Amino acid sequence: MKPFVGDHTIETILVDYTPHLIKRIGLFLLVLAAAIMMLTGCGGGGSSSSGGKETSAKPTSQLEKISSYVKATNGFNGHNVRFAFSIDKVLAKMKAGEDLDFASFPAYNSLKENLTKAKTESSGFSDIDESTTAVLKVLDEMVPLTSKMESYYTSKEYTTDGNQKGREMVASYLKLYDQFNTEYSKLDSAISQHNSELRDLLIEEMKKDNKVMAATYMEISRDMRRALEAIDPEDPAKTDKAQIEKLLGQVKENMEKLKPAEDVSGVKSFKSSAERAIGRIRTYLAGGGGNDAFNDMVEAYNDFIRDSNRIDASELDNKKK
């Protein structure tokens, strides 16, 4: 993934960890979090995933188990998107062998703290647990190093030694950076995969339980994410625009169907941000790609997910009193 200079660009600077566009989408897209945790009474349904631990637990209980991991990576990815410009700029200079006079990094420290807390209980999936351990191992070296680098440049110590110490730390950082990107991409992918699988199971259970509005709400988020994941940021020309338009059409169709019997907080904002995300996706595809359009698209998507997470799905099927 693209050099991580910068979550979620996600790309160059925004969300991914590769020197070019590659699959930064995976690392910078926020994941739908726990609004579903509020849902109760869903039927049981087992889930089993390659690389993960088999489980017969209900989707809701499994989603609850991984929710702390989702929040940890969402926070990290979101920070990278917001501060992508400065993070990417610094990373580009390091990779070009230029001396730095300023340091800006992803939020490694908070990621370490949040993953350490999450790890106190198993996620329920072996691949998530193993990847978390691997990421934390790299962060044990990354966090103190970046702290020293920030202090070194903030204090302007680099002016007293001709940046010699700075070059040494940059070399160490770039090695750790590659290791981190490798391990974090595995973790991010595992969390996203299991989260998606569990939500598909939950959608089916909700339909069986006649929770039509809650299922529709989840389908909107699912299809929006699938539309973005179908985009090839390295070569936009290879993107199947027809497939993406089909998914976006399903999103718009379901937004028309999402009409709770009672006013539910956040639904209007959710629909507005969905429309904005659809517009940014279409703009990106129509323009043939480009970093600015890509970052705008991912930012709009992440805003959509934030609004999604503000909805209490358990209220969507309440009947008027």
Regions found by a protein language model. Give the residues of each.
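A cross-kingdom marker for long, charged
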Residues: 246-321
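Secondary-structure edge/capping motif, primarily at the C-terminal ends of alpha-helices
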Residues: 80-97, 118-125, 146-160, 194, ...
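Bacterial N-terminal signal peptides that target proteins for export
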Residues: 17-29
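Bacterial signal peptide processing site
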Residues: 43-45
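C-terminal motif of bacterial Sec signal peptides marking the signal peptidase cleavage site
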Residues: 38-41
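N-terminal Sec/ER secretory leader and immediately downstream segment
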Residues: 59-166
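Immediate post-signal-peptide N-terminus of mature secreted/exported proteins
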Residues: 48-102, 166-174, 178, 189, ...
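Extended amphipathic alpha-helical interaction segments
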Residues: 166-271
